[in-house]
From Swiss-Prot:
Alphabetized InterPro entries for the sequence: Haem_peroxidase_animal, Haem_peroxidase_sf, Haem_peroxidase_sf_animal
Family under the similarity heading: Belongs to the peroxidase family. XPO subfamily.
Protein name: Eosinophil peroxidase
Keyword Phosphoprotein: no
Organism: Mus musculus
Glycan attachment residues as annotated in the record: N53, N114, N328, N364, N709
Gene: Epx
Length: 716
């Protein structure tokens, strides 16, 4: 019975992705009876729920048996949970119900049609309500004094703008094979702009790959610069993958068979691959979960599970249930919860997630250390990322304790909200004052992003779909090791240089190998990798990602390019046009844009036209702007996104009325260096923490780093 049901789901999923064919208009289907629509909705719910349950049981079984692959680990952290899962489930109900309806109504032998074109407005409302999509658009009164956890009511006119679990913004229309949902590269022989797309693994091999001897360290940026980029990215966006991670047809495990069946979109292996010799093998890949269709628009979009604001949601969460779990509910002091089993030299660590089958346990079975719990599910991805999460939980609790000393009459909720508000402002200041000028170049950011001029309710603050790929530029700055340094900034410990491929999901390294101080010193005193056109991504990420638990390590570059196709993102030239930049058409023009004829020739040998170059690889290949770590295209996209996140935020720290004048003056003195000083055993820090400094040059005593004076919060 289960096999038959899974087979039916597989056939249905394939049907849903059937594309609009080019040519004559479809024949008109019969009117839709309410009973037929209700039947389709009921059947869709059964199919979706069965697929979800089958997938969840399979992953749990592999985790329990210790046979989980890296894709299972990735799946665990990319799975939608709580409210996000309900939103994704609603979208799947609707997509599947529409697919069933099209199957029933389509005249035999006619071309496919769009079911939403023949449904009446009451029928569309019924479908939206029955699926759960309508619940996401409920009106509400906005009278909140503080930011909501979900980001709702930031914009009083449109309360859902920038809120969690909403569709990503589209700055350009999506481009799919079938104009609706099929990614380019799905159908063999299907052309894009007149040419076949190269395999993403082939692009990774020929453009991104480089010998380790060519690695160049960045003399101007520290590894902390790279790490803050990932931290802030996890504040802004997260597009979860489909909860159904096995091919439905006949219960096939597409990680074992490389079957291309929804939602599996495996990365194929080219001939003469330098590492994977079996061309019939693949790198598993699963599509991002869809968003609920908007109005009659059935073009696939993806959701952002996080708030779109720079609001420290990676510390506090983007869902109310998670935010409550993260708080210390044993007292009324406004504190965040911390670990009850372990400490870091007397200082707090993140609490454990307390899961029964924990993927972090697989990285060291004898250590028995589970994953940590934080505002973002990816906090245990690497110890470096965990270190920043830990740092800001400690800072919140430090602020809450100090605010209570100043205001003993404040309630626990007020202490929590005021400390959260300050931490949010800190993240905004560090990002816009210290980080972005080093990304974009100080001269350019003054000219393009400009000073803050106030809140504008007409600005759409939502994270753009393209930004979720473009901001992965930070992958090019990762060194192949995690560096840990002692109190004298020496690499004296036995595990001071750990290969990057050995630290993924290794929460045990925080507990049993010295805590976060050595990691933070390593981030401050080690230069980032410099992104160069002949050395883009280290092999620890390109060939060995999660290799410790799988026969084939994943390829992060290939995953990024496959994801851009999955999301229906337009190609390189479309984004150049969006930014008002030239659109190269031939070798000579692309050579001028890249200032590199050999690289341009490689691109055209693979893609045939610059129009088809995948946005991530095309953007990171551009020459860096003066004083920046990105080229013109990424600079344009980042400026656009970060301007929207600032000007469309009703709770921006500089907005009149959010903080008092005295409080704003006090906040201007904060720094990431000071946060390190206040919450660790480190006594000597980098003054300019994102710039490359080789100890002791550029390092000062914590006594010389300005402190935040909280007296402006007394009696507020």
């Amino acid at each position: 019975m289960m096999q038959q049901l899974l087979a039916l789901v597989g056939a249905l999923a394939t049907l849903i992705l059937t594309q609009h064919a080019e040519g004559t208009a479809p024949a008109s289907p019969s009117p839709v009876e309410i009973s037929v629509l209700r039947d389709c909705i009921a059947e869709a719910k059964l199919l979706v729920d069965t697929a979800y349950n089958h997938t969840q049981k399979s992953i749990m079984q592999r985790l329990r048996s210790g046979s989980a692959s890296p894709m299972d680990l990735l799946a665990y952290f990319k799975q939608p949970v709580a409210a996000t899962r309900r939103v994704v489930q609603a979208a799947d109900y609707m997509h599947v119900a529409l697919g069933l309806l099209e199957e029933r109504l389509q005249p035999r032998g006619s071309r496919p049609f769009n079911a939403t074109d023949v449904l009446t407005e009451p029928q569309l409302r019924l479908l939206s309500q029955a699926s759960g999509c309508a619940l996401q658009d409920q009106a509400e009164r906005c009278s909140n004094k503080y930011r909501t956890i979900t980001g709702r009511c930031n914009n009083k006119k449109h309360p859902w703008l920038g809120a969690s679990n909403q569709a990503l913004a589209r700055w350009l229309p999506a481009e799919y094979e079938d104009h609706r949902s099929l990614p380019f590269g799905w159908t063999p022989g299907k052309r894009r702009n007149g040419f076949l797309l190269p395999l993403v693994r082939d692009v990774s091999n020929q453009i991104v790959r480089f010998p380790s001897k060519k690695l160049t360290s960045d003399r101007g940026r520290a590894l902390m610069f790279m790490q803050w980029g990932q931290f802030i990215d996890h504040d802004l966006d997260f597009s979860p993958e489909s909860p159904a991670r096995v091919a439905f047809s006949m219960g096939v495990d597409c990680e074992k068979t490389c079957a291309q069946l929804p939602p599996c979109f495996p990365i194929k292996i080219p001939r003469n691959d330098p590492r994977i010799k079996n061309q019939r093998d693949c790198i598993p890949f699963f599509r991002s979960a869809p968003a609920c269709p908007q109005n009659r628009n059935k073009v696939r979009n993806q959701i952002n599970a996080l708030t779109s604001f720079v609001d420290a949601s990676m510390v506090y969460g983007s869902e109310v249930t998670l935010a409550l779990r993260l708080r210390n509910r044993t007292n009324f002091l406004g504190l965040l919860a911390t670990n009850q089993r372990f400490q870091d030299n007397g200082r707090a660590l993140l609490p454990f997630d307390n899961l029964h089958e924990d993927p972090c346990l697989l990285t060291n079975r004898s250590a028995r250390i589970p994953c940590f719990l934080a505002g973002d599910t990816r906090s245990s991805e690497t110890p470096k990322l965990t270190a920043l999460h830990t740092l800001f939980v400690r800072e919140h609790n430090r602020l809450a304790a100090e605010l209570r000393r100043l205001n003993p009459h404040w309630s626990g909720d007020k202490l929590y909200n005021e400390a959260r508000k300050i931490v949010g402002a800190m993240v905004q200041i560090i990002t816009y004052r210290d980080f972005l000028p080093l990304v974009l170049g100080r001269a350019r950011i003054r000219r393009t992003l400009g000073p803050y001029r106030g809140y504008c309710s007409n600005v759409d603050p939502r994270v753009a779909n393209v930004f979720t790929l473009a901001f992965r530029f930070g992958h090019t700055m990762l060194q192949p090791f995690m560096f840990r340094l002692d109190s004298q900034y020496r690499a004296s410990a036995p595990n001071s240089h750990v290969p990057l491929s050995s630290v993924f999901f290794a929460s045990w390294r925080i507990i049993h190998e010295g805590g976060i101080d050595p990691i933070l010193r390593g981030l401050m005193a080690t230069p980032a990798k410099l992104n160069r056109q002949d050395s883009m991504l280290v092999d620890e990420l390109r060939d060995k990602l999660f290799q410790q638990v799988r026969r084939i390590g994943l390829d992060l570059a290939a995953l990024n390019m496959q994801r851009s196709r999955d999301h229906g993102l337009p190609g390189y030239n479309a984004w150049r046009r969006f930014c008002g930049l030239s659109q190269p058409r031939n070798l000579a023009q692309l050579s001028r844009v890249l200032k590199n004829q050999d690289l341009a020739r490689k691109f055209l040998r693979l893609y045939k036209t610059p129009d088809n170059i995948d946005i991530w690889v095309g953007a990171i290949a551009e020459p860096l702007l003066p004083g920046a770590r990105v080229g013109p295209l990424l600079a344009c996209l980042f400026e656009n996104q970060f301007r929207r996140a600032r000007d469309g935020d009703r709770f921006w720290w500089q907005k009149w009325g959010v903080f008092t004048k005295r409080q704003r003056k006090a906040l201007r003195r904060i720094s990431l260096s000071r946060i390190v000083c206040d919450n660790t055993g480190i006594t000597t820090v980098s003054r300019d923490i994102f710039r490359a400094n080789i100890y002791p040059q550029g390092f000062v005593s914590c006594s010389r780093i300005p402190k935040l004076n909280l007296s402006a919060w007394r009696g507020k």
